[in-house]
Amino acid sequence: MKPKFLFEQLLSRQDLSSDQMQEVIHACMTGEFSDVQIATFLALMRMKGETVNELTAAAKVMRQLAHKIDLGNPLIDIVGTGGDGRNTFNVSTACSFVVAAAGIKVAKHGNRSVSSRSGSADLLEQAGFILNLSDSQVQNCINQCQLAFLFAPHYHPAMQHARAARQQLGIRTLFNLLGPLINPAQVKRQVVGVFSTNWLKTIATVLANLGSERSLVISSQDGLDEISIAAKSEVVEYRDGNFKQWFISPEDYGLKHSSLDAIIVDSPEQSLHLIQSVLSGDSGPARDIVLLNSAAAIYCAKDGISFDAAIEEARIAIDNGKANLCFNKLRLLTQTLNKESNHE
């Protein structure tokens, strides 16, 4: 599809067909489109609004172009779209250690920051984790720690063609929405945070279209792409072929309604400090938001568990020291694996 005709169609707010979307995404991901053309496409899609069919088609292309990794099942991913502009610490990354410590295998798909002050990869590298691991090393992490981090550029090399356009735009784009949909381990259960409640049903439907068994898509009424401690959060749950909408408030689970001020960060260093504080057992707003979002993943991953029980499992995983142990064990393991591969 020629860029000129694509842009005219989007300017007139006409949706793209699945075939058109696949063609355009392929052009963006193979170097056929220039940075200016990619940026124009992304900006016009944002103005028009991405549809279920467009996102499903785009995710299918991205999955086809990805370097896939088979880590077995069941697995869960906990991920946010970003783009909420709130600059909270890396809650989903913190939750990954808690959920793994609760005995659930986590394949955490993440990247460096594009639209926030601290992406999951920025934080982990600050802490000393090695992210560029081979498939067998990633499997080793899952086997020993129940958790592996899948560094997006390694699994989605085609994304390099859109990196400059995204960074120059500096705004939330289609790719924020796609990131949670293209986990290279092809997880079947996911907790996905989105930056606006307007996107809940759309993303849940796309996940269902892509073969998800169970998902929780979450957005808070104060604009976080996760369960908030400062407002009610809305959930669209997909399970057994059905969609269900429900709400979560911290007070419903014995947690304090708190301002977000205490969990806003300016850097990966600050985010790391908060995460280590939570995993060490410190109380406060950071712990509470990690408990709520970890519970969402435990609830999504386990059959027949209530949200109350899931919060208790998250609390135990922190208070018995296992979440902190997981953090330190995985960090050391990635460093050891990296040294071994460098000596081969």
UniProtKB/Swiss-Prot annotation:
SUPFAM superfamilies noted in UniProt: Nucleoside phosphorylase/phosphoribosyltransferase catalytic domain (SSF52418), Nucleoside phosphorylase/phosphoribosyltransferase N-terminal domain (SSF47648)
Organism taxonomic ancestry: Bacteria, Pseudomonadati, Pseudomonadota, Gammaproteobacteria, Legionellales
Record pathway: Amino-acid biosynthesis; L-tryptophan biosynthesis; L-tryptophan from chorismate: step 2/5
UniProt-annotated binding residues for Mg(2+) 2: 225-226
NCBIfam families, alphabetized: trpD
One Gene Ontology MF term: magnesium ion binding
Annotated residues for binding of anthranilate 1: 80, 111
Superkingdom of this protein's organism: Bacteria
Protein name: Anthranilate phosphoribosyltransferase
Binding locations of anthranilate 2: 166
Assembly behavior: Homodimer.
Pfam families: Glycos_trans_3N, Glycos_transf_3
